[in-house]
Amino acid sequence: MQAPHPLDLARVNPDDFDIRCFDDELRTDELCVRLLHAVRDRLIVQGHPPQEAGELCGGADYFLRDFVIAECGDNLLRLPAERVRQFAGHWYIVRTLEPNRQELARLLAGVAACYRVLAESALVEPSRAEAIAADCADIDWYEERIEAFWAIEDDGFTAWRNACPLPPPRP
């Protein structure tokens, strides 16, 4: 199997990442892979060792493809402000066998790096990338959420869930 050809970041059309139906989701998932290859290449040019650049994009991949695209149906270039907190403070915790600070920090480092490159490429507003980076850096709060999840007793899940709710289910 041949590796996907990276997208040319200068020629990306944000509208191509809109998701209105299942076919759009499949197309967007493929575009996301190609986008992440381009981000990886840009990180390498910026001085990141290839393995580190790949690991950063791996973290962004999980967030973008499994949560933003598949779960939320969002355009990753028009990401709602609350998505990082919903991912790290809820979705990751309930979808991971053993959620932990170290793994989550690696994932979020990739998300922040990816959105920094997207901002540098004028694909997202710099203020959006900065807000995403700030949410990615709030690892102490996410660790508190993990600990609170493991401490849930009786009907405490509802209160835990309501403190950081997920977006409504897609139609």
Where are these regions (language model features)?
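Flexible interdomain linker/hinge and immediately adjacent N-terminus
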Residues: 2-22, 131-171
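Surface-exposed polar/charged interaction patches
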Residues: 38-49, 63-66, 70, 94, ...
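Amphipathic alpha-helical protein-interaction segments
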Residues: 106-144
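N-terminal "first-domain core" detector
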Residues: 8, 12-64, 68-70
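Exposed alpha-helical structural elements
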Residues: 31-34, 38, 83-87, 131
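Non-catalytic DNA-binding core/recognition domains of DNA-processing enzymes
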Residues: 49-120
